[in-house]
Regions:
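Surface-exposed, charged secondary-structure patches
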Residues: 110-151, 203-217
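Bacterial N-terminal signal peptides
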Residues: 13-23
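Short beta-strand edge/turn micro-motifs at domain boundaries
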Residues: 150-178
């Protein structure tokens, strides 16, 4: 059984730090420190949500477009998908790898869309970065502050020619890629790679049908 959307959405309901201001020049993006990028992005997305009445009201199409255009470009989906699929990734054909990336991305887009629709008055505390000069992979550790206990939210990031990109996310001690790897392995063992693709496609189709439903007045 794949990760329950409701449970994961509950975990990442404050995972808004992934947002990106796409007007940022490429040169600045490539020079920006990873912890500063997370801090800036968190402020950007909070400002966007507070200013956009459609997002606040739960307009699913608007939220999905927001996530797809502003968040996902800062995620290394090739690495994330390959890691989630595990050893079976190398056995997959190029076409299967392409489909896996597409369906996995769609799944995460809708998951984050559900998370962003729940953002209210949270703030983020970015902890001091523990890294050496020249490091190309780091973990940026943060806390989400709101009602109740602080929520641990950490990012695994890698330095690329286009700046720092996220390839894994830790919420309350649970790494996203590791969680999906376990579930994907079970699906592949039972139904093969094509079976995993079909399962992801079905979940995304069902999610799209739900999103297309009538809006409440």
């Amino acid at each position: 059984m794949l990760l329950n959307r409701r449970n994961w959405t509950r975990l990442v309901a404050t995972a808004f730090g992934l947002s990106l201001n796409l007007t940022l020049p490429l040169a600045r993006a490539s020079e920006e420190a990873p912890d500063e990028m997370i801090r800036r992005m968190s402020m950007d997305v909070l400002s966007t949500i507070k200013a956009d009445k459609d997002v606040q009201s739960g307009d699913v199409r608007k939220i999905i477009n927001f996530v797809d255009t502003m968040i996902m470009p800062k995620v290394n989906f090739l690495r994330m998908t390959a890691s989630a699929v595990g050893r079976s990734w190398r056995q997959a054909t190029p076409e299967q790898q392409k489909r896996l990336q597409e369906e996995f991305k769609n799944l995460l887009v809708r998951t984050y869309a559900g998370a962003l629709s729940q953002v209210q008055d949270q703030t983020i505390n970015v902890k001091p970065l523990r890294a050496q000069a020249g490091d190309t992979e780091v973990i940026v550790r943060t806390e989400i502050l709101g009602r109740g206990e602080p929520i641990q939210l950490d990012y695994r990031m890698e330095k690329t020619a286009g700046g720092w990109k996220i390839y894994d996310l830790n919420v309350l001690g649970v790494w996203l890629v590791e969680t999906y790897r376990t579930q994907f392995a079970q699906e592949i063992s039972a139904r093969g790679i094509d079976g995993l693709i079909a399962t992801l496609a079905l979940r995304n189709k069902n999610g799209a049908m739900t999103s297309a439903g009538p809006k409440k007045n």
